[in-house]
Amino acid sequence: QAQLALCVLDVDHFKQVNDHWGHAIGDELLCHLTRLLSQFFPDAMIARFGGEEFALMVPHCPVPVLLKRLEGLRQQLRQQPLSREVPLFVRASFGVINVGRLSMDEALCEADRQLYQAKNTGRDKIVSQDA
């Protein structure tokens, strides 16, 4: 069975970004994140779940490899401002699983559980049951 890793991610404190910077900047942040996701994961299927939550399905990718790539993305988000005009640094939380034999509903549920563990234990981190 081929490896299939799933990551669900959520921008931390996105409502505060919209409240402080405005919805146009919030939209710019989401576009910026989408571009970075496409650059870091050209082989992934990327979906926006609404709001500021995204899912990545990465085929032929063991979870430890995905975790390394996600950490690179997380660090770039932390260190690179949204733009010169907007000194906003993005923080995000990530939940990662190996899909294995789970149905897609089960996989999304489990990845979401991992995401909320990241959120509930300090945010701006990656949590995986498979680490």
Language-model regions, residue ranges each:
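Catalytic-core segments of nucleotide cyclases and related cyclic-nucleotide turnover enzymes
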Residues: 67, 71, 97-131
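Short hydrophobic/aromatic beta-strand micro-patches
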Residues: 57-59, 97
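Conserved long alpha-helical elements within nucleotide-processing catalytic cores of c-di-GMP signaling
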Residues: 1-5, 12-39, 47-51, 55-56, ...
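Hydrophobic/aromatic docking surface of two-component receiver
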Residues: 60-61, 102
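Short, conserved catalytic or interaction motifs in soluble domains
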Residues: 19, 59, 82, 119-120
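A short pre-motif secondary-structure segment
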Residues: 45-48, 88
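Short, hydrophobic secondary-structure boundary micro-motifs
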Residues: 6, 85-86, 126-129
